[in-house]
Amino acid sequence: MSHFSTVKTELRQLEPLVQALEDLGYTPDQGSQPVRGYRGQTVTADLAVAMDDGGDLGFRWNAQTAAYELVTDLDLWKQSIPFERFLSKLTQRYALNTVLKASDSEGFQVA
């Protein structure tokens, strides 16, 4: 029996998170979105990535930690890389996009 897993992250800004997902080839949908799991179960997230073979990815804001949590049904994970590797790549892209955004807002130009 599958169930949704909630993974705490340090992802705190929406724009770099969306850009990181896009950089990795995903198409995130913003706003209150359903995240599909086992046998049609759903949870609501602030940002979602629909996966063709089920097991959507969702991100919902946790006000207590001031960060987004990743919500997915890990039993339905069917991507080409393990979940842990995906999360590592997402975090790396997020960090890069956060630095680029901060540099741009400070007036630096990145080539």
Each language-model region and where it sits:
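Interaction-mediating elements
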Residues: M1-A111
